[in-house]
Amino acid sequence: MGLREFNIFGRMKNVLFVFLVVTCIKTSAQSSFMDYQRNFPRVADALNRKADTLKKQFAAAGLQWPAREIYIRSFKFDSQLEVWVRNNSNEAFKLFKTYSVCALAGTLGPKRFQGDYQVPEGFYYINEFKPNSNYHMSLGINYPNPSDKILNADDPGGDIYIHGSCVTVGCIPIQDPQIEELYILAMSAKSSGQDFIPVHIFPIRFNNPKSVAYFDRTTKDDTSVQQFAAKLKIVYDYFEKEKKLPIISINSKGAYEIMN
């Protein structure tokens, strides 16, 4: 009996040791990420000018600073990009800011091949921080995602960013002052442990009658775009009701499905 107890406690010690090592490594990596970003003049300058203001805005909204967890969603026809924030995964998201998207390429509907000038539609996450972008600062998204790879042409394209300036051939530009804020928020969330910052891109606000009317009018002869948008709307509706993100999967045909 004593030997069995010894083995149990020995195993617990090993588990605890591994947990502590992994935690230390993750914390170190997060700290290193922030330190690395601060080495870039644009990031350091933006932090000096904007961090205090963002901190006060967070306090006024009842949010903890630095940002713990953020969610980004963008609406193509409505030319808006929202930033939602919450303090932890048990809370509902709160809308923090809405930025104007100052330029748009292409039409409604998903991106399907290199050079179509389309802004993607679907469910993504930030996979790159680019502090020395040609467009001031840029946040890359993981286009093409697994759905895009199934549904798209052999060359679906890539290099899709949320960035500064006000030009685009398929990205999401929100001008320099706004990308500085968003970059700081995303950087803070990543440094706080949010490895996957979701970015959802919708063709329209599905609760805006004018947007819905425009979508119906311009896609009336394209059932594939309509069917694709209907899948996106399910996720939109879920978030509008719950203020939390559903678990999203992709089936063998490339279609999005909600798992909860």
List PLM regions with ranges.
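A conserved hydrophobic position in a structured secondary element of the catalytic/binding core
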Residues: 174
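Hydrophobic transmembrane alpha-helices
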Residues: 202-203
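Bacterial Sec-dependent N-terminal signal peptides
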Residues: 1-34
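Cell wall/extracellular polymer interaction/catalysis modules
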Residues: 30-169, 177-197, 206-260
